[in-house]
């Protein structure tokens, strides 16, 4: 069945409301639609068309998914919970051709590897020093994006890397760009919540701010551990936020969800504190995006700068300035 993107967003929103046990009147549904940001479609005609297709029922006071609509709604809610699915559909191709993004990467990360994350070159070097990769080892890059960082690591350390990402455009970009390096680089579209990795096949795992999208940390970590060879290790960067009123102790390294999951699994790990560095990173990222905004817009890539500025101003700088964020590098020995 062919659906418009507006219809897809309505179905995903109804499923979100169902999962969260929230009311589904039209006003409340649309009040939460700002999570789609600039990618929000006009839903005006979508309710009626979805009813005609037999996928929803009800009226403005409350819509419900039909038996036919529920499986589709589950699929779209999983795939497109917020703006990021839409963002990544556009980002990789745009960034590859963007001189403004190349300049931002040089200013913020210290080198242009077409980055879209929070790990600059100094932090990446710290992670690689801990992992101590040996020539010929097999490495898994979780959430590899377009694979430029994976390619850089493979070239520098003479290792083979498999990159995994849920975004089809990212994997397509990575595969096309690295055709000549197929013996060392492989890229797969996949879901970190449903890993299917051969036992004893991996020497090291790299995760640069990707485990936020895992629904069950212990389950995913267990699947990774099964795939690890003896002496395997993981390098994981993650941020941790607390809300207003939460105790500051919840930001301690031993109190994070990742630390608790690793402890429950009986895994040996250490942490390095990168909280100061993440503050410096986001201030630099915000300034570079603002300074380069007109260049991005002149390329037709204004959404990249707008997204970085929005993230900095809404998601990061307030928590950084009020001490409600911590960042750690986890070194895990399996």
Feature-to-residue mapping (PLM):
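N-terminal, positively charged/glycine-rich alpha-helical extensions of SAM-dependent methyltransferases
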Residues: 59, 63-107
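Conserved class I S-adenosyl-L-methionine
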Residues: 233-257
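Conserved Class I S-adenosyl-L-methionine
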Residues: 274-334
């Amino acid at each position: 069945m062919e659906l418009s993107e507006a219809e897809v967003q309505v179905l995903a929103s109804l499923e979100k409301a169902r999962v969260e046990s929230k009311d589904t009147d039209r006003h409340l549904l649309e009040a939460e639609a700002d999570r789609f940001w600039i990618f929000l479609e006009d839903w005006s005609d979508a309710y009626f068309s979805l009813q005609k297709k037999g996928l929803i029922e009800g009226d403005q006071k409350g819509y419900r998914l039909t038996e036919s609509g529920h499986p589709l709604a589950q699929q779209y809610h999983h795939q497109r919970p917020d703006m990021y699915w839409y963002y990544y559909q556009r980002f990789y191709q745009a960034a590859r051709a963007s001189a403004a993004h190349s300049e931002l990467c040089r200013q913020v990360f210290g080198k242009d590897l077409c980055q879209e994350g929070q790990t600059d070159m100094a932090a990446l070097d710290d992670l690689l020093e801990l992992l101590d990769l040996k020539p010929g080892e097999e490495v898994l890059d979780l959430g590899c994006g377009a694979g430029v960082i994976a390619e850089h690591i493979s070239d520098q350390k003479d290792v083979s890397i498999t990159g995994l990402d849920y975004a089809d455009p990212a994997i397509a970009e990575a595969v096309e760009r690295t055709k000549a390096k197929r013996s060392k680089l492989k890229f797969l579209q996949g879901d970190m919540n449903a890993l299917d990795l051969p036992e004893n096949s991996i020497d090291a795992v790299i995760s640069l701010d990707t485990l936020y999208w895992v629904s069950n940390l212990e389950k995913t970590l267990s699947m990774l551990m099964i795939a690890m060879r003896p002496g395997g290790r993981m390098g994981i960067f993650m941020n941790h936020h607390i809300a207003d009123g939460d105790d500051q102790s919840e930001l301690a390294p031993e109190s994070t969800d990742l630390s608790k999951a690793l402890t429950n699994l009986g895994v040996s790990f250490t942490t390095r504190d990168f909280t100061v560095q993440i503050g410096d990173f986001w201030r630099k990222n915000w300034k570079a995006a603002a300074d380069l905004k007109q260049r991005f817009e002149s390329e037709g890539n204004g959404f990249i700068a707008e997204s970085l500025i929005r993230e900095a101003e809404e998601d990061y700088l307030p928590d950084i300035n009020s001490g409600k964020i911590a960042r750690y590098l986890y070194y895990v020995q399996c």
